[in-house]
């Protein structure tokens, strides 16, 4: 499957999918399925999780998990809301989706407040624009787009804040490969070195 990563990135980088398909088929369907099937903890951690489940220490809920605060925490799956669990402690152990509007990063927050950066949006015909969660950048150069959607000449962003334009931005480079993220870093460095200040 990893052999498909670069062709998929090519499709994304060259905007070869209609925005509606990009939203529903890629970001909302394929990406979660890919994450579930091909990205995850090592086998040993899964075995440890299964042991905790079998011991009754850990319970996995179904989709659309909801947490409410009554006298204690109450959690349940919206699809199976007849089974509810109560606890005095709650541990959140999921990786949230990328969302620049919800970032806790003080630098990104300040750039957002100062309107130097803004969220990337997909324009979908007959729909409200879809915010991908990424910072608006030029997908080819990774230059940050200003309020007028023109790239800043020397302001770049790559990696996790661009997830929603690029894909698998948190993936680590594997030895012996021409890793996408290292190519992007090289491209940005070369652009900066050739820029006249």
Model regions and ranges:
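Flavin (primarily FAD) cofactor-binding/catalytic cores of flavoenzymes
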Residues: 1-196
């Amino acid at each position: 499957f990893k052999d498909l990563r670069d062709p998929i990135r090519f499709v994304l980088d060259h905007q070869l999918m209609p925005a509606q398909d990009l939203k529903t088929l890629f970001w909302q369907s394929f990406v979660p399925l890919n994450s579930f099937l091909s990205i995850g903890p090592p086998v040993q951690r899964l075995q440890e999780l299964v042991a905790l489940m079998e011991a009754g220490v850990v319970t996995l809920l179904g989709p659309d998990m909801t947490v409410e605060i009554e006298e204690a925490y109450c959690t349940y799956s919206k699809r199976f809301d007849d089974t509810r669990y109560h606890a005095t402690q709650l541990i959140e152990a999921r990786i949230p989706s990328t969302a620049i509007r919800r970032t806790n990063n003080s630098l990104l927050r300040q750039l957002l407040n100062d309107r130097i950066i803004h969220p990337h949006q997909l324009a979908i015909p007959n729909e409200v624009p879809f915010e991908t969660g990424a910072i608006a950048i030029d997908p080819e150069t990774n230059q940050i787009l200003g309020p007028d959607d023109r790239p800043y000449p020397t302001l770049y962003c790559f990696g996790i804040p661009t997830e929603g334009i690029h894909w698998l931005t948190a993936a680590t480079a594997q030895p012996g490969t021409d890793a996408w993220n290292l190519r992007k870093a090289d491209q940005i460095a070369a652009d900066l070195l050739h820029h006249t200040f």
